Each structure stands twice: as C-alpha cells, then as structure tokens.
C-alpha cells in the first residue's frame, strides 16, 4: 500500500446514510441510471474511495432518478434534487450538518 492510497480513502460518505434513509440499494441506482454506471462505482462512492467529479455526478444523477421514480406525482413537486456536494464529503462546497429539505418525504417513501 502506497502513501497516496490513504489520501483517496475518505471513509463512509453521506451518500451511504442517505441511501439507507431512502431505502435504496446499489442495484436501485444502477438500474435507474440512464448512463453507464456500475455497482462497483456506486459501492466505491458509498465507502469513500475518491471518485472523479464526472463519476460523482453520475452517481448523484442516478440517486436523484431512483428517488424520483419512487415518488407520487404530488410528491415530485416538493422534491429537492441533491447536488453532488451533499453526497460526498470531499467534494468542493460540502457542508456538514445541513438540514435535509426532503426529510418528510423520506419517511413517506420508506413507509411504502
């Protein structure tokens, strides 16, 4: 193991907790993605292995689409799409402790 590998491992990401809160699996994101996204990329993103900006954005789009597909029409109107800097703590503009505007929707969707 070289010295740089520790710099690329950022530990569990907010994405991991948010996927659990929404009741999503890696497969849900891969299935929802219109792009070429694979299970390995999603897993690396969840566990904190540093992704390129392009891959972070792919994962972010798949995450938002997977949630969107579970929402009813009236819920879609209030859904706040997550930017990548809410999902990865090493991305530029990340702020810990943000209040999630979708907390109410999470409970409704998980209850189904």
Please give the residue ranges for each predicted region.
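Residue-level signal for the short linker/turn that defines the boundary of a DNA-recognition helix
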Residues: 13, 24, 37, 51-54
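Key DNA-contacting residues within the recognition helix of helix-turn-helix
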Residues: 30, 39-43, 57, 71-72, ...
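Short amphipathic recognition helices of helix-turn-helix/homeodomain-type DNA-binding modules
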Residues: 69-108
